[in-house]
């Protein structure tokens, strides 16, 4: 499996619950290296642009409202099979259906406030990463085992 990058977002509910460090620790434990990270409060335009693929869906306005309701943590994660690994760690979109030990099972309230976002494909990961991070803001490095 190839080394790849994926976008991860700790959503406003995850920030509000104070689980940022726990979420990042789970990624690192699974071999996903944060190579870019920032906390920001998305504007309506940023959220609408990012989720434009869902514009015709009935949940679009609620999603944008939620994603602009508080700060988020944006991250680029790098590692072998990063997209699939991130999705496995996050768990099912609906926390009620998520496996035990996943981020959503452990921290999410419901399908709307499900704590994290992760790219769903390598192709979308490239688009999503570039939406929030110019290449100059991404810093790859080698892990030295402790």
From Swiss-Prot:
Names of required cofactors: Mg(2+)
UniProt-recorded Gene Ontology molecular function terms: ATP binding; metal ion binding; nucleoside diphosphate kinase activity
Protein name as it appears in the record: Nucleoside diphosphate kinase
Lineage of origin: Bacteria, Pseudomonadati, Myxococcota, Myxococcia, Myxococcales
UniProt KW keywords: ATP-binding, Cytoplasm, Kinase, Magnesium, Metal-binding, Nucleotide metabolism, Nucleotide-binding, Phosphoprotein, Transferase
Superkingdom per UniProt: Bacteria
Species whose genome carries this gene: Anaeromyxobacter sp. (strain Fw109-5)
CC per GO annotation: cytoplasm
SMART domains noted in UniProt: NDK (SM00562)
Catalysed reaction equations from the record: a 2'-deoxyribonucleoside 5'-diphosphate + ATP = a 2'-deoxyribonucleoside 5'-triphosphate + ADP; a ribonucleoside 5'-diphosphate + ATP = a ribonucleoside 5'-triphosphate + ADP
Function in brief: Major role in the synthesis of nucleoside triphosphates other than ATP. The ATP gamma phosphate is transferred to the NDP beta phosphate via a ping-pong mechanism, using a phosphorylated active-site intermediate.
UniProt-listed Gene3D superfamilies: Nucleoside diphosphate kinase-like domain
Top class in the EC scheme: transferase
Chain coiled-coil ranges: none
Active site: 117
Chief location of this protein within or outside the cell: cytoplasm
EC number: 2.7.4.6
Compartmental location: Cytoplasm
InterPro entries membership: NDK-like_dom (IPR034907), NDK-like_dom_sf (IPR036850), Nucleoside_diP_kinase (IPR001564)
Protein family: Belongs to the NDK family.
Binding site for ATP: 11, 59, 87, 93, 104, 114
Keyword Cytoplasm: yes
A GO BP entry: CTP biosynthetic process
Pfam assignment, any one: NDK
Oligomer status and interactors: Homotetramer.
